[in-house]
């Protein structure tokens, strides 16, 4: 690899390459500044947007031409003869904003408008200044029609890392790129009480929003272009490269604690019964009108490096969020969002080292310290009164480290061939500390805090990409090919002994249940007439709230992946473009796969384009899905009861007839159109996603017959085939009238997923993947979501009003786990009728809701702006449910979430 890099350097060292910085102002014919004008160096993907005052700075090659485009205005091309440019845009003959994109096409000239596949381009600076959203997942939840993410509660690790998805697919079925380079996933696998259970995803919140120029969302299958995971689409995050500009903001906000609902007297976190966070999680303290207070401080600054257009751009971000507490049942007094303290640093660097040759480095470090309440222990064998009189609510705290760095060389030969050689290293480490807890088998001698171990994932990716544009072949041919080599390593590391062990009455870890026994307490439900009833109950071991990983759980596994791809786009005429891609992948642990893609765009008129694509795709099983395991032991007078989430390569897994995990296989198709009528633009795209062999997590199987001292077993399996159809809609309008700027956008997604097949083989279907599991999978996204965004601005003031409608969502609660006979209403009912009774009782229906966001912005000076506003202004909550809800509160984590109205103020600056 070093020889290749040296060869590329020597190949181009003879050429001298000069860049310069050009700045200026863009105005309309009346002299009003135009913010958000798209500016692109012609023939490249190098581009910026104008700021609030219409100003811009951009680094370009000598002699470059800049293209200025803005919705409702004529596009203007301007040569960069000097360092200062003044541009006047004419409202006649308006054109659609044509963002040049990196994702979805390897052509440096392809824009959103003329792409053959749907792409959203989100200007993060605009979104962050026009809303109170603090993290990337929150921003995208309301800015992108098919993106969905929600804060979780009572879901162990998922309380600390939000699961997110595109088009209702799994969190691991969307590929994330940073500046076109593959981003590593989180080491966390979602297991309990959350969407995306059995999946790993990429933690977008580990990337500071202030470091991002724009986010490109390719809403189409792209495994043939980018490899594994790109079944639902690709999210490419393009980071800032501006210089001589110091920007940032200080934001403070808090949530309204007045949760709307009809709650019984004494309900935790209602008036007079707010959980006292200074106690053990089982006593009440003072009322609060607001909670979840958050402070975010972010800054971004870039400086030139050398005199030929080099730069280093640095972002720092600090975010502190307190817990929210919402009405919960007696067994979940700490229902609400986790507390979080986070520090983010990101650096983007590039410098020319020869003619048309650039060295680049980018990467960041994110650290988060999080704290979430688990379920409450009120009494019984899990409570030691000497430590926690009256019970306690344990806290699951975590330390999350996310680090990444990418480095590479980009160059262009004299013949127009472009080469990009890079290496990207990323690692996520997730450590658990359980606080306010105990190991009940140690009784009053138990510590109240344990190191419970954790897990990590390392990914190293090496890429070599080549491309060339042939302008003389028909309307233009862009040819690209390349290779990728990836190494992945997954680890589970054990916690301290007390976090996982069960101790006998002498305080010695139990290794032989025939000679050792755990401490017991009297069984309050003992029935002498019942031969299965015991007069005593054994105290369980391990840290309450989250049992630690033991040495038996430890894993240190790795694999490699090698891929080759080719990608071509041909403009047959000015109206017709076709593209195709083929990619070969070989994994060291499961074998190889080949995938392809065809796409086309037809200009029906100057204003309307028709586009469509069809592709095959795949997702390799993650190392976590193959090797993750949990093993914990319950002891009673009758002996040991062991429960195991078995790794895919275990003997127990094979004994149940469950096969080695294979890749998920997908077929994607899309058809849509774009329309541009000056001030008005629209895109509508329908899609089909068929996925075979989706990897899911089974229910608990009886394993006592295996003779392996395991009583219950659970597995990852290629268990489900799904079919998803849907429609994405984006309609926008912009108009400038004198000094007034008006804009409106309607974005929406309609999504329908069906389960075609449950691949349970000879195993009982309801245990393999039961009704509750199906409901959680199908509710990964609301059946439809629409948002109407209205904006107004002038020199010193701007305002935004947004309405987001979430459709009805249905889930099945814990009543599906009860004895079906409890739901028999007549002795003559059939089992099928009883089942329907139970399912009807277990159905939690969340009716459609509309959420309103409002923001007001005031220019205090040329460099400072004050914004105030509210997310969920009218304090809307999902419909209230009963005490069978998964998370122990009165709502699941659906639609707009369970936190209510959020009010904020932000002071932004730009020097």
Regions found by a protein language model. Give the residues of each.
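C-terminal beta-signal and adjacent terminal beta-strands/loops
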Residues: 7, 691, 805-832, 857-911
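Short, acidic, small-residue-rich periplasmic hinge/interaction motif at the N-terminus
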Residues: 27-42, 65-73, 82-129
């Amino acid at each position: 690899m070093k020889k290749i890099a040296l060869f590329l350097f020597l190949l181009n060292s003879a050429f001298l390459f000069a860049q310069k910085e050009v700045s200026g102002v863009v105005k309309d014919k009346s002299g009003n500044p135009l913010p958000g004008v798209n500016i692109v160096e012609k023939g490249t993907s190098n581009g910026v947007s104008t700021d609030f005052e219409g100003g811009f700075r951009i680094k370009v090659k000598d002699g470059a031409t800049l293209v200025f485009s803005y919705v409702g205005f004529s596009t203007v091309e301007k040569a960069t003869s000097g360092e200062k440019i003044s541009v006047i845009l004419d409202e006649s003959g308006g054109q659609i904003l044509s963002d040049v994109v990196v994702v979805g096409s390897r052509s440096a000239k392809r824009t959103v408008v003329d792409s053959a596949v749907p792409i959203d381009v989100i200007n993060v600076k605009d979104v962050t200044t026009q809303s109170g959203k603090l993290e990337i997942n929150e921003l995208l939840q309301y800015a992108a029609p098919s993106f969905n993410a929600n804060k979780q509660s009572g879901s162990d690790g998922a309380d600390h890392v939000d699961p997110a998805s595109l088009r209702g697919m799994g969190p691991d079925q969307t590929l994330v790129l940073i500046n076109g380079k593959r981003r590593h996933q989180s080491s966390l696998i979602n297991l309990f009480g959350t969407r995306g259970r059995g999946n790993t995803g990429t933690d977008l919140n580990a990337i500071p929003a202030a470091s991002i120029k724009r986010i490109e969302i390719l809403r189409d299958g792209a495994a043939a272009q980018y490899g594994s995971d790109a079944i639902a689409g690709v999210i490419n995050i393009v980071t800032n490269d501006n210089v001589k500009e110091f920007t940032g903001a200080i934001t403070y906000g808090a949530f309204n604690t007045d949760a709307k609902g009809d709650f019984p007297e004494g309900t935790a976190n209602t008036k007079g019964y707010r959980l006292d966070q200074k106690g053990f999680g089982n006593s009440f303290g003072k009322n609060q009108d607001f909670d979840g207070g958050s402070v975010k401080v972010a800054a971004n600054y870039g400086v030139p490096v050398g005199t030929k257009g080099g730069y280093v751009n640095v972002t720092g971000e600090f975010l502190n969020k307190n817990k929210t507490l919402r009405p919960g049942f007696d067994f979940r007094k700490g229902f609400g969002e986790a507390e979080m303290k986070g520090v983010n640093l990101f650096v983007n660097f590039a410098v020319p080292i020869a003619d048309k040759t650039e060295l680049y480095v980018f990467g960041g470090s994110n650290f988060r310290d999080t704290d979430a309440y688990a379920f409450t222990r009120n009494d019984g064998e899990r409570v030691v009164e000497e430590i926690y009189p009256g019970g306690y609510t344990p806290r699951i705290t975590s330390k999350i480290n996310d680090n990444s760095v990418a480095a590479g060389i980009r160059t262009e030969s004299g013949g127009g061939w472009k080469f990009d050689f890079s290496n990207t290293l990323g690692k996520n480490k997730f450590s658990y500390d359980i606080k306010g807890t105990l190991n009940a088998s140690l009784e009053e001698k138990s510590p109240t805090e344990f190191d419970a171990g954790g897990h990590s994932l390392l990914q190293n990716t090496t890429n070599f990409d080549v491309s060339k544009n042939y302008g003389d072949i028909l309307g233009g041919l862009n040819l690209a090919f390349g290779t990728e080599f990836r190494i992945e390593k997954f680890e589970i590391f054990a916690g301290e002994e007390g976090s996982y062990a069960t101790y006998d009455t002498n305080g010695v870890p139990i290794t032989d249940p025939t000679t050792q026994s755990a401490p017991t307490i009297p069984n309050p439900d003992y029935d002498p007439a019942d031969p299965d009833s015991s007069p005593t109950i054994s105290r369980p071991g391990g840290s309450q709230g989250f049992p630690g990983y033991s040495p038996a759980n430890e894993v240190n596994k790795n694999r490699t992946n090698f891929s080759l791809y080719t990608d071509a786009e041909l403009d047959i005429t000015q109206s017709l473009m076709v593209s195709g891609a083929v990619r070969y992948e070989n994994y060291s642990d499961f074998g190889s796969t080949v995938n392809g893609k065809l796409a086309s765009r037809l200009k029906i008129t100057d204003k309307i384009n028709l586009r469509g694509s069809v592709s095959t795709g795949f997702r390799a099983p993650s190392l976590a899905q193959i090797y993750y395991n949990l093993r914990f032991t319950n002891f009673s007078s009758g002996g040991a009861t062991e429960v195991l989430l078995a790794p895919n390569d275990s003997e127990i897994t094979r004994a149940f007839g469950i096969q080695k995990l294979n890749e998920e296989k997908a077929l994607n198709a899309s058809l849509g159109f774009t329309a541009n009528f000056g001030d008005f633009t629209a895109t509508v795209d329908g899609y089909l996603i068929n996925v075979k062999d989706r990897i899911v997590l089974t229910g608990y199987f009886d394993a006592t017959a295996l003779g392996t001292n395991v009583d219950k077993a659970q597995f990852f399996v290629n268990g489900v085939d799904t079919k998803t159809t849907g429609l994405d809609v984006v309609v926008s309008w912009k108009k400038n009238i004198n000094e007034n700027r008006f804009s409106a956008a309607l974005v929406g997604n309609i999504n329908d997923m069906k389960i075609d097949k449950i691949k349970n083989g000879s195993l009982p279907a309801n245990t393999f993947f039961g009704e509750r599991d199906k409901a959680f999978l199908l509710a990964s996204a609301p059946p439809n979501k629409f948002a109407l965004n209205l904006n107004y601005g002038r020199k010193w003031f701007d305002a935004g009003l947004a309405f987001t409608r979430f459709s009805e969502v249905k889930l099945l609660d814990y009543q599906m786990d009860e004895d079906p006979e409890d739901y028999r209403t007549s002795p003559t009912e059939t089992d099928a009728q009883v089942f329907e009774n139970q399912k009807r009782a277990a159905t939690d229906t969340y009716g459609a809701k509309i959420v309103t966001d409002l923001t007001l912005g005031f220019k205090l000076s040329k460099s400072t702006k004050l914004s105030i506003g509210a997310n969920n202004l009218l304090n809307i909550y999902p419909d209230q449910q009963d005490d069978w809800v998964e998370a122990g509160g009165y709502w699941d984590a659906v639609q707009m979430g369970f936190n209510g109205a959020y009010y904020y103020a932000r002071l932004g600056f730009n020097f």
